[in-house]
Amino acid sequence: MRHPKIPILKLYNCLLVSIQWELDDQTALTFQEDLLNKIYETGANGVVIDLTSVDMIDSFIAKVLGDVITMSKLMGAKVVLTGIQPAVAVTLIELGIALEEIETALDLEQGLETLKRELGE
């Protein structure tokens, strides 16, 4: 079965990701690899990940998302999560995904503003 790729768009020195469907394990792992490669290739120093269309995540997807955030930070890219639905927020907290140092915003527009502020632009 072919898994859909999540589009990663470059805007100035940032990457924009809008996840438009529920993730399965393979798609999440492919996204992790694709995003890290894109950060490396473009030298992006910021990433906005929009989860508005994601209503629910399981423990594996939550772990992959946490890993993506940590790995992006290790590569020098600040991450802002946007559009977190209530059930997703509950799952992330219940699973102990550390979000204390992660910037969040209600929507993509606020996420971009938050990222610009974080990057001092």
Swiss-Prot record:
Enumerate the Gene3D superfamilies for this protein: STAS domain
Species of provenance: Bacillus subtilis (strain 168)
What subunit structure does UniProt give?
A: Interacts with RsbRA, RsbRB in the stressosome. The stressosome probably also contains RsbRC and RsbRD.
Any idea where the STAS domain is?
4-115
Q: Recount the PTM note.
A: Phosphorylated by RsbT. Dephosphorylated by RsbX.
Carrying Phosphoserine, the residues are: S59
User: Keywords on this record?
Assistant: Phosphoprotein
Q: What is this protein called?
A: RsbT antagonist protein RsbS
The set of disulfide-linked cysteines is none
Q: What is the protein's known function?
A: Negative regulator of sigma-B activity. Non-phosphorylated RsbS binds to RsbT, preventing its association with RsbU. Requires any one of RsbRA, RsbRB, RsbRC or RsbRD to sequester RsbT. When RsbS and the RsbR paralog(s) are phosphorylated, they release RsbT, which can then bind and activate RsbU.
UniProt signal peptide: none
Entries under InterPro entries matching the protein: Bact_StressResp_Reg (IPR051932), STAS_dom (IPR002645), STAS_dom_sf (IPR036513)
Among Pfam families, the record links this protein to: STAS
Under the heading PANTHER family, the entry gives: RSBT ANTAGONIST PROTEIN RSBS, RSBT ANTAGONIST PROTEIN RSBS-RELATED
